[in-house]
């Protein structure tokens, strides 16, 4: 039986003690400093999960992710989800998992994930994705819904994914492609975060949220040896 006391180091729920989920960037907006951390803490994810806020292209992307996971994640696997939010993906896969571990820096999301995980082989922890308090390697690591594109220390997150799922090909990212920009602009507007800056590699909103998109060339430069496949017209799946 999985004993979290044996596998986890110190779990740090306090934001003051967290070194930032991936050294999140802080920006100045109307004289105030905000970050993705602040925006998520204000409940952005909870609103984003509401299907009525999602353009059709975003809904198709999320459905395609789940379809892929149900093909990749097989019976009895042990899986870790980086940036799990409220545990959506692990909860959907729990019927086939031997163990699911979800991690996120936003403690309120972890509390919500725990609330739905009763009786399932799932554990959720508040921690930093660049310093996961887990000792033993698992079978598979994933970072989905372009969460990796909101992290600034992407290389360190990849290193932790490799450490915790050392088998080549046992790590999966899903990220937005440049084709996602129109759908994301509309989605963020519906969420009350209208886009104020569009750059070749990211969108920035008036609420302080920064979300990146990736070309295949940029992905290969960041990830290294990997397999890249298009997903739902607006994203890529990256296996490494």
Where are the language model's segments positioned?
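Class I SAM-dependent methyltransferase "Motif I" SAM/SAH-binding loop
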Residues: 83-85
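Short alpha-helix
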Residues: 206-225
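A short acidic, Gly/Pro-enriched loop at the edge of an enzyme's catalytic core
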Residues: 130-141
